C-alpha cells in the first residue's frame, strides 16, 4: 500500500489541555508554505506477514512522475526477488509516462489502483495520520531541514513499532496473514 504525504512547516493544530486563562499558542516563524513530500509504502511479505515502512524524502517539492518512478526503483531494490504488487491511488504521477516505463522494464512489478476517494482503504494513509496529526501536531518547525529530520524521526519510530504498523494495515481493513 503506497501513498504520498506532505509535511508542512505550518503545524497541524489539535486540541490540547491547558489551565483556564492560559491558552496555548503555537508560534510559527514562517508564512512560507514549504513542505517535505514523502512517498511511502507499508509493505507486506505475504508468506511471513512481515511489515515494513519504506519512505523517500523530497524537500520543497511535489511528488511528480520522476519521484514516483524513483520510489518504484526503491521498492524494487528493497524486494529484489519475486513479484511485487503495489497498490496506490490515482494520482496523476502514478500514471505518468516515466512510471509506465519503469513498469514495462520490470515485469515482476504490477501496479493496482485504489478507487477514487478511498483513502480509508490505504494503510499508508493511517501512517501519515499518525505522524502528521498526532506525533507532529502543535509543533512548529522553523526550517526545511528540521522539518525533514522531524518527519523522518517520527516515521522511523512508527516503522520500528511493528504492532503499530500492523494496526495501520488492519485499520484499512486488510489482513496481514493468508
Description of each model-found segment:
Residues 96-106:
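Short, aromatic/basic amphipathic alpha-helical patches
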Residues 125-178:
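C-terminal anion-handling pockets and recognition modules
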Residues 3, 40-42, 72, 89, ...:
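Generic structural signal for small/hydrophobic residues in well-ordered secondary structure
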Residues 2-3, 82-94, 117, 122:
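Acidic/histidine-rich, metal-coordinating catalytic segments
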Residues 9, 94-95:
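Short, solvent-exposed loop/turn segments at secondary-structure junctions
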Residues 24-31, 107-123, 140:
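RNase H-like polynucleotidyl transferase catalytic core
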Residues 1-73, 172, 176-177:
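Extended, low-complexity cationic-aromatic segments
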Residues 75, 111-112, 152:
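A generic "structured core" feature
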